[in-house]
């Protein structure tokens, strides 16, 4: 039973990372493919299309990394501030903190006597850990790493973004838009199904949802490209 529980905990962590990776790759695919399609629809030559796509890849990856770094850093700062405050309160008012932990367990369904016993034993073993986990909701096993999160976010975005760029290099010059659109939609369907499967949702529904928005984004940028291409 303990082996199953241990496996389930690690599976939850892996699913979280998988979903984040899929979302990053989706962002890279949709944004870069849409940019490539829009520039190609404007009648630009292959070198111009590739330069625009590569610039979009770099800008998007850096933006994702910066956003993830700021987000995770802010979360980490908030958690550390909460833990520091809890440490001070445990030092200054230990009885009040024990009462607070007891009320927390009573609210979860334990009777007051048992809740007091649990709170007392956990406090004797690791008071800060008990309060961090059960009062603040900060799991002991989950630690946010801003730099790691930023690198993963940038890398997954770049992996998705490089797909339409490769197709733009290999496709016939006159059919770059078509080849990029078809390849991107197929890749989005696969990623959408993978993300849905990781989250326990229906694979077909997840694939169609992502594919629809990808198609809409590329259609919108193609329309803009054609409009400005005609005007020019």
Stretches found by the model and what they are:
Residues 190-215:
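Interfacial loop-to-transmembrane junctions
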Residues 222-232:
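Juxtamembrane boundary at the C-terminal end of a transmembrane helix
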């Amino acid at each position: 039973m303990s082996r199953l529980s241990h496996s389930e905990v690690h599976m939850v962590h892996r699913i979280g990372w998988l979903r984040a990776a899929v979302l990053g790759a989706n962002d890279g695919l949709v944004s870069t493919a849409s940019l490539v399609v829009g520039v190609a629809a404007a009648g630009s030559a292959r070198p111009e299309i590739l330069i625009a796509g590569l610039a979009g890849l770099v800008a998007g990856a850096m933006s994702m990394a910066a956003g993830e770094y700021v987000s995770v850093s802010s979360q980490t700062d908030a958690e550390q501030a909460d833990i520091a405050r809890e440490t001070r309160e445990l030092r200054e008012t230990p009885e009040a903190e024990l009462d607070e932990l007891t009320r927390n367990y009573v609210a979860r369904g334990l009777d007051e006597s048992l809740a007091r016993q649990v709170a007392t034993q956990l406090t004797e073993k690791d008071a800060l850990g008990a309060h961090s986990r059960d009062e603040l909701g900060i799991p002991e096993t989950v630690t946010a790493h801003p730099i790691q999160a930023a690198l993963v976010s940038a890398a997954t975005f770049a992996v998705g973004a490089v797909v339409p760029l490769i197709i733009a290099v290999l496709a016939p010059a006159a059919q770059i838009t078509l080849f990029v659109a078809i390849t991107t939609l197929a890749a989005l369907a696969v990623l959408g199904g993978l993300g849905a499967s990781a989250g326990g949702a229906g694979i077909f529904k997840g694939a169609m949802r992502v594919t629809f928005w990808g198609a809409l984004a590329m259609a919108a940028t193609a329309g803009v490209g054609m409009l400005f291409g005609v005007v020019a």
